[in-house]
Amino acid sequence: MILRGHHGAARDSSAAGPVWVTKVDPGDGATGVFRDTPVLARLSHPADAASVHTGSFRVEECGGAEVPGVVLLSPDGRLLIWTATRLLAPGVEHLVTADGLKDHRGRQVVPHRSRFMPCALARDDLPG
């Protein structure tokens, strides 16, 4: 369903249809990412909290080693927040995978993969 308002057409995210990851930060192909940066994923529909865990939303180093971390869900159910429990490896490509998530209606979220590369710095390394 398309809604029309003062600012043009917009998608009605409550309508039936596919459920997908609309945005990930750091973005696909990002470089120079701080080693302590959380990974954020915005969903088109609220997630079923029971489907949100480190098996369904994870970060791995190139080569397949999973990075230990925790994943939280925002109160509105649309934002996944993954935080590493150690600093990310600098200069190593990291793969973000969302696979096995469901929305609050039980519909499968379309699997997502993206990549980013941390630099040698963490935010705490910066002065000030």
Regions found by a protein language model. Give the residues of each.
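Acidic, low-complexity Ser/Thr/Gly/Pro-rich repeat segments typical of extracellular/periplasmic
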Residues: 3-8, 13-128
